[in-house]
From Swiss-Prot:
Known function: Two distinct, membrane-bound, FAD-containing enzymes are responsible for the catalysis of fumarate and succinate interconversion; fumarate reductase is used in anaerobic growth, and succinate dehydrogenase is used in aerobic growth. Anchors the catalytic components of the fumarate reductase complex to the cell inner membrane, binds quinones.
Identification of the protein by name: Fumarate reductase subunit C
Annotated source species: Escherichia coli O81 (strain ED1a)
Gene it is expressed from: frdC
Domain of life, source organism: Bacteria
Subunit and partners: Part of an enzyme complex containing four subunits: a flavoprotein (FrdA), an iron-sulfur protein (FrdB), and two hydrophobic anchor proteins (FrdC and FrdD).
Higher taxonomy: Bacteria, Pseudomonadati, Pseudomonadota, Gammaproteobacteria, Enterobacterales
Keyword Transmembrane appears in the UniProt entry: yes
Length: 131
């Protein structure tokens, strides 16, 4: 059966997400994918520079020392930290851990994830700088 009646479609502006702080933060969090793509491309270029010898690597290091690139990389770091924070806050909601017939709160899980992140960062920096 077909109908000639046109269904009602509620109008939606392109700025619908700007009305509530929750949606603005959601769009900001999803926007952290763009700096992640930048870092991935930069890392791939660094690997190719490393493969192509000392001259290519020196050129890549010079590229990284450009003030504009340093600012972009700081923005990328901030975006990665924001993304990490939101994922760590989401993790306890996905894992129901029960201790002595009570559900564990989110704080120990979040603190554990940050502790693992800090330890892994220190180990990687130690190996990279002193090994």
């Amino acid at each position: 059966m077909t109908t000639k009646r046109k269904p009602y479609v509620r109008p939606m502006t392109s700025t619908w997400w700007k009305k509530l702080p929750f949606y603005r933060f959601y769009m900001l969090r999803e926007g952290t994918a763009v700096p992640a793509v930048w870092f991935s491309i930069e890392l791939i270029f660094g690997l190719f520079a490393l493969k192509n010898g000392p001259e290519a690597w020196a050129g890549f290091v010079d590229f990284l020392q450009n003030p504009v690139i340093m600012i972009i990389n700081l923005i990328t770091l901030a975006a990665a930290l924001l993304h990490t924070k939101t994922w760590f806050e989401l993790a306890p909601k996905a894992a129901n851990i029960i201790v002595k017939d009570e559900k564990m709160g989110p704080e120990p899980i979040i603190k554990s994830l940050w502790a693992v992140t800090v330890v892994a960062t220190i180990v990687i920096l130690f190996v990279a700088l002193y090994w």
